[in-house]
């Protein structure tokens, strides 16, 4: 169904989105959770519609329509506020697929509408993706993925993209595989695009995206691009294809499907498919012109996501799968051409009992102004400019080589059961001979087809070149004088070219007849050729994939080694920080001890002064003794003399004790100073060796104890000195 009006389209898509979320509302998140193609298309359609509304005067109306849509009777705006809860305990609230889809889509839509600065978008997405990692870590839902729309991606710098990539690459327990692949693709694409002239550009409205490599469908879905968007490619890309639609499931299973694709011959397309909201829409770019060594998505199983998302393979575990030959090639959709009328009352050939596959297909065009030609089937043979297009179908439908091999196997089995002398021996030998001849004929036809196709391509290119030259010569002829010599020469050249063109057309007609005879009449040659091409292609892709696997294995081994080295470095750094802290503590303690030693040196100086005073007191005592002797000789009263003598003896004893005590303290201080100097020297040596710290600690403790003893002795000496002076 084609949609045109923006508001009507937004209303319908918002309703579809709400309905899809309701269906998934109670599906609990788990390792098997994933979004179907229908759900992914619904998400892409609503985000595209909001992006388109940003360039109109209805900038916020589409978003308001989405907010007012109801889920289980409640508006989406209120439901979103409830499950978000200001970012508190989000991983516990978002526990189902429906809540996950609503949370991601509403966050992206609000960001598109309200944010325009790259830093603001980056800040929002950083917080948002950390919440996503918490959800994936809690429920292990590695296949859940709703990527950033292109409307936000184009506003981010490559540094922002790399930082967002690191959010997922560093959260090893998050199991957000598709998000990691998404940002890895954006990173690879940026650096390859900056150094390459080859590119494919997809754009709609004001949003565009360019890539020199293949773009998987889930990347296109995340960026919100569709096959109906404007596509432009550089002229050097010759083998480029756009997948547009899923046709059917392969082998009636959901593990793989057959898709339609369009080969991009022109440099620009205004869309290659119709703009619809169908559930089976697909959009992926296959670029076979790029070197496979720089492209992770050459493998078909990585380019096209299966219907069941949990069956998707990772890059490291994907087996070679190149079923591109099984997909159906279709022509590009042109919205300027009228649609074929299928209900015209003309009897179809197969309706009369004929074989449907053997009947020619008649394309009926709309009636024009001529009443006689109101309904006229188109006959390609009457069109001189008609070039037949040979399309491929499923290889398994008419692989006659496999049929021949099966028949030979069956005949061998019959011969064993019937015996060598059976009545059917002659018939069996004749059948084997015919099959052998048929096999040889198939090989001959195969080589002939390859030769004819090469000649056909060469002749077609030559015809196009000659046609272009004839057109140029006709333009020259129309602009010259008929009586001039150059005009005669031009006419002669034109006649020769026309004759050559007639010969080429005749040769081309023969080649087409031969191709029609072999490929349409005897399909086995075409199928055999396609089978061989597929085998060759598979072998080449298998070799490429094995080389990529080896490279990845080497890179992973190197990454593992680097991680181990980083862990060891972190451990050494932690030990070094601890050692530095310990050394800093000991340095501070040593500084304290040095200050105390300086204080005790001052006390030693004071003690020297005391010693000098004691010596002076000794001299005074001697002087007193001499005076006492003189007094004794001069006085007869001895009682006072005895008292003075006892006082002198007492003072002498105290003086002797003080001198002895002072000398001991000086000796102890000198010894401690020498030990402290030796300790300082050893400490300087120990600063380069962390193992000496413990020994220094014990020695410093002993030194502190001795200093405390010395302090007590000095206090005792001070008391003695006070007693002596008194």
Swiss-Prot record:
It is found in: Virion. Residues 347-360 have a biased composition (Basic and acidic residues). Keywords: Late protein, Repeat, Virion. Residues 612-713 are annotated as: 4 X approximate tandem repeats. GO terms for cellular component: virion component. Structural protein that forms a matrix surrounding the mature virion (MV) through interaction with protein A26. Presence of protein A25 in the virion structurally prevents direct virus-cell fusion mechanism. Interacts (via N-terminus) with protein A26. This is A-type inclusion protein A25 homolog. It comes from Camelpox virus (strain CP-1). The lineage of its organism: Viruses, Varidnaviria, Bamfordvirae, Nucleocytoviricota, Pokkesviricetes.
